């Protein structure tokens, strides 16, 4: 596939660094496209373009901006299948997921913030008969979005939607593992009427990200990725006092009580570990099951997990796709071997799939370990693959303590038919995204983000729009100025 690498000032352009990288199809190891790494000059061009675009975009009324964003939503939905197919080739995830979720959920978020944009307003308060003040919610300026490789186009839309709705410009850097669909999103924004420069795309590795996080003309950075990189991004951003949003890693607990609907609990645990072949930051990889239903749970879990279809992601029957890269495949397989050595019981899975034409891809069979303990490496560390750890519990207070005993705090879930217990337990979970009797839903209206080392700030929901604004206070004197000097 031939394509320009960058999108700057309303058009696709080539990078000028002379360096290139190759996007690889995770399902077969074949190259998809060769792209150019952005140079410092390219990044400067993107920033200068964004300044010009911001001047035009921020001067528009919120209703005018909303109309353009809604037009982009219309185009995105019309091209859902084409975009989903490209996303599958780039990520290795099953087409049945991408065609239903990835583009659609991102378009929903743009639509949500387009509708919310005209509600941005300030306050007014009288101070005396002759004096009052009012406030304005003003855009920050140029924002940087740095995406991850598991949901490339969805993340690009989640980050650009509130930024653009509030009147900002955005420079977006997708992961170098999945660079393709962000360029398509930029084209669609332009087609919808977005002024040139308001959404630019630069490509490359961590060096390009560092150019953005260090640049004094970038007002805010929104980053999705692993916690170690997030710390570095936040540190770089602090040098110029940038606002930051960080959506980072997790090792989330799911607690299944003895009165839970067993079928639902098993279904949710499978979704929470095997959807997108386990490459989801909110995965509920620590599944705590009450001792009285433990055997029934793992019996059903084993039977149903072994029926999952792993194969060519482009086949609509496929439920488990390919991991993003050979390097990541090796990390997941290493984590599985450590789990075996730790004393956990391998219930099912535990190996790379190489038959049925999958030998050149990065396929790992859905894997479940039982008889796990909290101090085992695979229970403590984020694996980001299709690996579930099942642990027993008997006491409510004890399982709450165990569930919270982690450096992460992204998500948590509780399964019970006791409404009082559901609220009591979920209120004690140290996590930013919590579910009761379900897992994984993330509607545009709901703020999402982490506690502890899982992040800073929120994405989606009404408060996120405010994160892309700054408050200006204006005091008005209607009478004579009272000078303290004669």
UniProtKB/Swiss-Prot annotation:
One of its GO terms (biological process) is glycine betaine biosynthetic process from choline. K(+) 1 binds at residues 23-24, 90. Keywords: Metal-binding, NAD, NADP, Oxidation, Oxidoreductase, Potassium. The active site is at residues 159, 247, 281, 459. It holds the Pfam family Aldedh. NAD(+) binds at residues 147-149, 173-176, 226-229, 249, 281, 382. Its EC number is 1.2.1.8. Its cofactor is K(+). Binds 2 potassium ions per subunit. GO terms for molecular function: betaine-aldehyde dehydrogenase (NAD+) activity; metal ion binding. It catalyses: betaine aldehyde + NAD(+) + H2O = glycine betaine + NADH + 2 H(+). It comes from the Bacteria. This is Betaine aldehyde dehydrogenase.
